[in-house]
Amino acid sequence: MTANPSYLRTLDHFKVGQVFHHLPHKTVTESDNNLFCLLTLNHHPLHSDVEYARQSQHGRILVVGSYVLSLIVGMTVPDISGTAIANLEYEKVTHDGPVFVGDTLRAETEVLDVRVSKSKPDRGVICVETRGFNQKNERVLTFRRRVLIPTEIPPAYRPYSSE
């Protein structure tokens, strides 16, 4: 068994200004949206009732914004937080545009800051900004987060590492 090498990133793999283009992209399905609504008890008709949505600003069902955030965060895991000790903070979450069933989303992340912890030098914090786009290259989501990253590959990952 081999691990995806991107999951083995430690603090020294991150540089300010570095941009990651995350794969794979994802086409949002009606089932994705419906399941997320059910799991989170979001029963707003804008996300599930075609007739109600037809009368709305966009004229069709809108994908739940918290699903879009969750999906885009998930896309970043292999490159950004695969070895994370913790996600410390999400901030400045902005829904920049609507997402509809059938949209194909992609994400990119820029490293804004990297610092070693003063109290625990075996780890550090990265601050990143992630942007989500649809198939028309329109930005649909932006957020920043701080992630606690180890300075060495965690013991659980060492069997998969070449170090």
Feature-to-residue mapping (PLM):
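Hot-dog-fold acyl-thioester-processing enzymes
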Residues: 2-90, 141, 151-163
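HotDog/MaoC-like acyl-thioester-processing domains
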Residues: 1-16, 99-104, 108-163
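Catalytic-pocket segment enriched in acidic/His residues
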Residues: 60, 73-78, 83-113, 118, ...
